[in-house]
């Protein structure tokens, strides 16, 4: 299944939670979810008891859409997490958090992961001094992530940094905003990653 490219705010209304897909609009309280906090449709979707499988699928979809990964990428990451020693769900979240596009977003250089992905694919990002244009590139502890020189005054990046002042920066990155670079200091602990996803249901889904 390809990466979702449809109306992103409909996804948030479908799931009833913010997936950080519309950064500035969400912060301003102007997102579709803020205005219409019910599922898309004339009267919204009817509420009913969701099955166990439905719940598992829902959590997987939320994680996929939030991090902007395809089904193939998601399955590959889950398989890697399952092979490692430790809590599979926590390891999965850590692997998702280590994606370069996500790290650029977490450092506050983009208001959404989607824009962060564009920055990466268009060649605006350096990793340890080398240009990397692969959004799924895995960032390891100690890596330096930097905006290329000619893009440091990009108005969208500047605006993202300004908005970050309202939300703050996560604890596992150190950022020099004025110099437009940051250090991915470590993998996050699960309790530090505030996302509306219960990964245990994803583990149950793929463990069948």
Curated annotation (Swiss-Prot):
GO cellular component, one term: small ribosomal subunit
GO annotation terms (biological process): ribosomal small subunit biogenesis; translation
Domain S4 RNA-binding span(s) in chain numbering: 98-163
Cited NCBIfam families: PRK05327.1, rpsD_bact
Family under the similarity heading: Belongs to the universal ribosomal protein uS4 family.
HAMAP family: Ribosomal_uS4_B
Designated name of the protein: Small ribosomal subunit protein uS4
């Amino acid at each position: 299944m390809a990466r979702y490219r449809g109306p992103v705010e409909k996804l948030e209304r479908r799931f009833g939670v913010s997936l950080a897909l519309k950064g500035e609009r969400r912060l301003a309280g102007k997102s579709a979810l803020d205005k219409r906090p019910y599922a898309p449709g004339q009267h919204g979707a009817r509420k009913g008891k969701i099955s166990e499988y439905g719940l598992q699928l829902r959590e997987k979809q939320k994680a996929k859409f939030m991090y902007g990964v395809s089904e193939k990428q998601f399955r590959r990451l889950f398989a890697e997490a399952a092979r490692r020693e430790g809590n599979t769900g926590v390891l999965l979240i850590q692997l998702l958090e280590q994606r370069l596009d996500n790290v650029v977003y977490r450092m506050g250089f983009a208001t959404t992961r989607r824009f962060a992905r564009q920055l990466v694919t268009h060649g605006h990002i350096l990793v340890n001094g080398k240009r990397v244009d692969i959004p799924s590139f895995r960032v390891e502890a100690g890596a330096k992530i930097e905006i290329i020189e000619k893009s440091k005054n990009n108005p969208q990046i500047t605006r993202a940094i300004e908005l970050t002042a309202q939300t703050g920066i996560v604890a596992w990155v150190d950022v020099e905003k004025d110099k437009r670079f940051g250090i991915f200091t470590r993998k996050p602990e699960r309790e530090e990653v505030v996302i509306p996803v219960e990964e245990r249901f994803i583990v149950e889904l793929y463990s069948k």
